[in-house]
Amino acid sequence: MAVPTTTFATPPFARVGASEEELRAKGVDVAVHAKPVAKIAAMPRPKVLGETHGLIKFCVDPETDLVLGAALHTVDAQELINLVALAMRAGVTASELRDGIWTHPSSTEALNEVLAGPPRDA
């Protein structure tokens, strides 16, 4: 079961599912979509608050497109992680999260941008 956790720091760090390191240690093939918060154009709130440090990272099964884990170190991470956890439990794919229509402007729009980029190499 995908149970989210959050460390309430500034900015918050939230996580759900397996980490990239855990998946690779088990020999699981994983596509990693990650982007520094400062480079996410679709996410204005961190810039407005002056908290642009951090990272949003998704581990995706390249065969099924299911999210295997996510780590969010950003403004509103404690809220965004709940959406990601629900998506994981419901079998929503990374592509469906990427193509979602979210409130504008909101931190949720980061999903469109982070998941749209090509996965990085191991």
Regions inferred by a protein language model and the residue ranges of each:
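N-terminal periplasmic "start-of-domain" segments of outer-membrane beta-barrel proteins
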Residues: M1-F8
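Flexible, glycine-rich terminal cap/loop adjacent to redox cofactors
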Residues: F8-S19, R24-A122
